[in-house]
């Protein structure tokens, strides 16, 4: 009985759901669900609430717009709007959770109730409209103020003449409905005739037609006389006929639906009665059948399980059979092999048996002979044993007497041991008390040691901050481990402390005089890895992204591991040196800051070989020689003619570094098989742009691998190696002079004595963070070089450069720099024109030159438009005076521009193109002051420096008050 009732309930629910789907299909054109759709399919279509809101708006236009503001993006809001409309109508609703995950019966009941309510209202309007006049219907419409509901016939479609077209219904009838500025009597007859002859009334919505009727009736009531023009009456008659036609169609549809529903109800009642009769008569049979069915189901499930188990057993047996067959085949093959081996073994054993038989026969004869001899020996042994037994009996008597004496001694020892135990117990108690006192004292020592380490760490942090504020050159010392095969050598390193101490032992002296202690910022022992070394300098390198200039260089004798520390022995990640790790770290940080900052990274790699600067990343490295800027430039370039390669990732850096290392000058000496014969300089330029405020920052990282200092008698250098060693020692000596001058705070620092010190001028001269790696050899043979290197490092650690400054430029400074660049370009063009005029003047007569020159100058002035530049006229006059003064200074000098080295042969004349190339150097007096404002003041007199042994010209360019003085010529 329960099963039948359940089936009937499912059947009834399916019919009601199909009825709802049929009704929604008539209302919504895009509703395409089949009538036999499940609850889940209907739920998926209605769950967002838009279809429910569309149904409510379709049945009652404007009910959502005035109250709720249209559809919402949230599905719960749409469903709540629909439920509010249903509640206002007094119809049963449903819960939001029922629509999301509950039963669909409540949703179906709600929609059917809404359908019945709409059909009831529509039937009442039809009966009233057929019995009353148009004026009465119009007045009732005003009283009820309810919308006329139009429900499409489900399962049917209007004919082509009645299908709604948005274009047709939106053009003709809307012009009449929205005619507000005039009256309907003012409508022209041609427009009304066009509407009547076309299908505009057929395609127009019922609401629009009712508005037309209401408008005409309102107009007639307002006139009070009731006079309506004939054309308007004709229009009104057609509109009313169309409305009555539509209402009739709706009434026919409702009657058809009612008859269909009654027929279905009669069928369902008869089926219900028959089912009730059948159910009442066959309850017991149903129960028995159900029980049997359950038993059959259980047996069927068991049979299915057995069948599945049998199939699994069959599959398993088949697999086992296949495995057994494979095993049998392999065993058969093995058996054949074993048979063959057995035959061979049997033959070998037979041969061995014959040999053993012959051997045993010989052994038997030998055994018989030995037996005869053994019998003789037994007789001799028996005689000797009797003698020995007599001796042992005598010894036993002696031992017995000895044992008696020992027992007496043991008694005495036991008595003494008791006394000793008592004494030991007393000592243990004394020791226990002393140990407890020692533990208490030791705990105090441990606490004091912990506090000592904390205070030591704080002091180290404060010391680093003081060093940062003072701008001291950080000095890190690294001890090279012994090379393979040198483990047996003596070392000069006696002790390495945790706080930067290193103790050097002198093998030729004894006692305290044989030891020398040095202290630096950090000392790395022989077992320190590349990662440990880089972790200590990582914060220093990261400050490059904040706009600081950083310089890291390695100093030490040949073979002390400078190139190992800076570049590493190979390209594997574990062997990376400071160069690779620094650039990789910069890329990682720039990637993490990409939302706030945009960074551009460029790489230069040059070497100083025999006092010549060469580009290691250029193809013509052997021919091209580069000059050095003697002053710090706004773009941070020290060697501007060297190729600057932009890099985007670590792989780009690896490729460039591999090219640079292959082009670097190396050679073999007695101290190092692959000795660096030049100073390698890797310069990383980082330009940052703040995405928010547009400010820029510029940082420069110099990674310098100095060539090793060496003694000629130890390196056994000759020929080119000797010349290279002389240049290397000379440049390192010049570096020592610079360090000594900085340590003494002299007014003049001899940067110009070497190309190396010129490159390091921007780093050693302040406004930069500088770090020096001191590389030393541990062997005792290099003691003198080690002491010399550590003394130099100790002197460097005392140099104070002042606090480093960040190179940041605001948006205003950036605009001023752009204006300066445009002025430089304009003045460069003017210089070229002036030089052309001078050439014309030297070639042509004076009269022709003056006339033509004035015309040419007038034309060039008008063409360039110098007066339109955004600079005051007073600044232009000062700038022109500065340019003229600069031209006079250059005329008195040898024509070498800023940062350029003169390589042209003596007596060679410069072409106009070369002078044009050097022309921008004449405007270097147009500079930015400290507050970011442009200035064109004259430079102060140059500092005159006496000539040194390096044949350097005096007049080093000095930056005074923000202006750039004229550089001098260098060779």
Swiss-Prot record:
Residue ranges occupied by any Calponin-homology (CH) domain in the UniProt entry: 14-119
Database matches in Pfam families: CH (PF00307), Kinesin (PF00225)
GO cellular component labels: microtubule; microtubule cytoskeleton
Residue stretches of biased makeup (Polar residues): 839-881
Residue intervals of the Kinesin motor domain: 472-799
Keyword annotations: ATP-binding, Coiled coil, Microtubule, Motor protein, Nucleotide-binding
Coiled coil as UniProt keyword: yes
GO molecular function: ATP binding; microtubule binding; microtubule motor activity
Region (Disordered): 839-971
Protein family per UniProt: Belongs to the TRAFAC class myosin-kinesin ATPase superfamily. Kinesin family. KIN-14 subfamily.
Protein name: Kinesin-like protein KIN-14C
Organism this protein belongs to: Oryza sativa subsp. japonica (Rice)
Gene this chain is encoded by: KIN14C
């Amino acid at each position: 009985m329960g099963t039948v009732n359940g089936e009937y309930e499912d059947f009834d629910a399916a019919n009601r759901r199909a009825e709802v789907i049929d009704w929604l299909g008539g209302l919504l054109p895009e509703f395409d669900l089949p009538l036999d759709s499940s609850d889940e399919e209907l739920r998926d279509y209605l769950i967002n609430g838009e279809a429910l809101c569309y149904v409510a708006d379709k049945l009652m236009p404007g009910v959502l717009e005035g109250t709720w503001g249209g559809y919402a993006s949230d599905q719960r809001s749409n469903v709540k709007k629909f439920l509010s409309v249903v509640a206002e109508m007094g119809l049963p609703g449903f819960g939001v959770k029922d629509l999301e995950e509950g039963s669909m019966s409540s949703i179906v009941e709600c929609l059917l109730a809404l359908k019945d309510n709409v059909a009831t209202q529509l039937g009442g309007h039809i009966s009233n409209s057929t019995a009353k006049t148009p004026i009465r219907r119009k007045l009732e419409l005003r009283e009820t103020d309810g919308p006329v509901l139009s429900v499409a016939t489900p399962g049917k479609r209007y004919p082509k003449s009645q299908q709604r077209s948005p274009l047709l219904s939106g053009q003709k009838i809307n012009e009449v409905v929205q005619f507000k500025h005039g009256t309907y009597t003012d409508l022209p007859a041609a427009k009304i005739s066009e509407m009547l002859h076309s299908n505009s009334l057929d395609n127009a919505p019922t609401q629009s037609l009712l508005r037309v009727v209401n408008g005409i009736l309102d107009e007639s009531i307002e006139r009070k006389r009731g006079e309506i023009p004939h054309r308007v009456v004709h229009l009104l008659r057609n509109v009313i006929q169309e409305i009555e036609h539509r209402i009739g169609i709706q009434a026919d549809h409702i009657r058809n639906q009612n008859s269909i529903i009654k027929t279905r109800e009669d069928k369902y009642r008869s089926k219900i009665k028959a089912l009730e009769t059948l159910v009442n008569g066959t309850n017991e049979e149903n129960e028995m059948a159900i029980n049997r069915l359950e038993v059959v189901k259980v047996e069927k499930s068991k049979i299915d399980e057995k069948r599945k188990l049998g199939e699994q057993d069959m599959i398993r047996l088949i697999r086992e059979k296949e495995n057994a067959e494979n095993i049998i085949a392999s065993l058969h093959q093995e058996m054949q092999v074993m048979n063959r081996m057995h035959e061979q073994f049997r033959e070998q054993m037979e041969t061995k048996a014959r040999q053993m038989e012959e051997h045993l026969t010989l052994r038997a004869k030998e055994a018989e002979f030995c037996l005869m001899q053994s019998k003789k020996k037994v007789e001799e042994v028996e005689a000797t044993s009797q003698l020995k037994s007599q001796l042992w009996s005598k010894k036993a008597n002696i031992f017995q007497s000895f044992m008696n004496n020992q027992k007496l001694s043991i008694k005495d020892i036991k008595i003494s041991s008791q006394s000793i135990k008592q004494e030991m117990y007393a000592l243990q108690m004394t020791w226990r008390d002393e140990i407890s006192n020692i533990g208490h004292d030791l705990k105090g020592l441990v606490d004091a040691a912990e506090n000592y380490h904390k205070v030591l760490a704080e002091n180290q942090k404060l010391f680093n901050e003081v060093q940062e504020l003072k701008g001291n050159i950080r000095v890190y010392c690294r001890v090279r481990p012994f090379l393979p095969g040198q483990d047996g050598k003596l070392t000069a390193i006696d002790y390495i402390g945790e706080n930067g101490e290193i103790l050097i032992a002198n093998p030729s002296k004894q006692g305290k005089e044989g030891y020398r202690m040095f202290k630096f910022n950090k000392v790395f022992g022989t077992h320190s890895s590349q990662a440990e070394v880089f972790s200590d300098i990582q914060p220093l390198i990261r400050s490059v992204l904040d706009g600081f200039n950083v310089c890291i260089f390695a100093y030490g004798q040949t073979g002390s591991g400078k190139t190992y520390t800076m570049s590493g022995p190979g390209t594997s990640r574990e062997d990376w040196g400071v160069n690779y790790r620094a650039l990789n770290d910069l890329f990682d940080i720039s990637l993490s800051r990409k939302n706030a900052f945009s960074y551009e990274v460029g790489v230069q790699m040059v070497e100083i070989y025999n006092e010549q600067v060469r580009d290691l990343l250029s193809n013509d490295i052997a021919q091209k020689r580069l000059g050095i800027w003697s002053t710090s430039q706004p773009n941070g370039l020290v060697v501007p003619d060297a190729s600057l390669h932009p890099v985007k990732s670590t792989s780009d850096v690896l490729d460039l570094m591999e090219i640079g290392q292959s082009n670097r000058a190396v050679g073999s000496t007695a101290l190092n098989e692959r000795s660096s014969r030049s100073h390698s300089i890797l310069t990383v330029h980082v330009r940052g742009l703040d995405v928010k405020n547009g400010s820029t920052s510029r940082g420069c990282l110099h990674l310098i691998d100095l060539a090793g200092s060496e003694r000629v008698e130890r390196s056994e250098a000759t020929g080119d190696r000797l010349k290279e060693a002389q240049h290397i020692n000379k440049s390192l000596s010049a570096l020592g002079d610079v360090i000594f001058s900085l340590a003494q705070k002299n007014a003049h620092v001899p940067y110009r004595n070497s190309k190396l010190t010129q490159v390091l001028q921007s780093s050693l001269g302040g406004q930069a963070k500088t770090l020096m790696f001191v590389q030393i050899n541990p062997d005792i043979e290099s003691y003198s070089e080690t002491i010399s290197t550590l003394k130099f490092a100790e002197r460097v650690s005392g140099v104070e450069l002042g606090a480093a400054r960040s190179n940041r430029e605001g948006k205003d400074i950036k605009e001023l720099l752009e204006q300066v660049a445009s002025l430089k370009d304009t003045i460069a063009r003017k210089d070229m024109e002036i030089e052309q005029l001078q050439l014309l003047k030297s070639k042509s007569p004076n009269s022709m030159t003056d006339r033509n020159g004035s015309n040419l100058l007038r034309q060039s002035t008008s063409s360039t438009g110098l007066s339109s530049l955004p600079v005051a006229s007073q600044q232009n006059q000062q700038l022109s005076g500065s340019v003229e003064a600069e031209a006079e200074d250059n005329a008195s000098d040898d024509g070498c521009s800023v940062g350029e080295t003169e390589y042209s042969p003596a007596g060679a004349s410069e072409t106009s193109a070369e002078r044009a190339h050097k022309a921008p150097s004449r405007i270097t007096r147009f500079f930015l002051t400290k507050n970011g404002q442009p200035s064109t003041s004259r430079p102060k007199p140059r500092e005159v420096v006496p000539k040194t042994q390096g044949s350097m010209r005096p007049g080093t360019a000095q930056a005074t008050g923000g202006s750039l003085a004229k550089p001098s010529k260098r060779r």
